[in-house]
Amino acid sequence: MKKQLPHILSLSTVAKSRLFEIQAVELKFSNGIDRTYERFRPFNRDSVMVIAIDGEDLLLVREYAVGTEQYELGFVKGGMDMGETPEQSANRELQEEIGFGAKKWTFLRKMKINPQIMGHKMHVLLGEDLYPNQLEGDEPEPLEIVRYPLSQLDALLDSDEFNEARNLAALYSLRDHLKKR
């Protein structure tokens, strides 16, 4: 039996910046209990994460993360533009961030980032058969490209500098995909 969704009684904006809007969502659950939650306002813009393989290496980027106030190692990622497919967006982001496009794309999975407070979805794609092509991106500084041997995926999973949850989930998806080949 499908569980009845709570009824939304009201929505209001409690805070807003140029990047985020936080909403208070007043709900009534099927058992009669009222509760107010806060969430990021839903937006209809998914994102992509690109696992790029060049020969026997993963191509990672090291870029500044203001949340941790340090440089973090991870996969290429970015927002999808209106009208783009995940593959088109992934190819654009790859060219903007590391100067390569990919001829072969494999969809690995879709992830929800934090569904308790946001409706955002991220598409994880594997890009192979790379070719050089640089597009202008929106990064404030050039990103460092880091080659990591595919033969050392377990070491990367254990690395202290590769520890963001989305990257780890994507790397496990890649490992499962490669085992099936």
Which sequence ranges carry the predicted segments?
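Extreme N-terminal tail/first-helix region
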Residues: 1-17
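Acidic pyrophosphate-coordinating catalytic loop
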Residues: 13-18, 30, 42, 66, ...
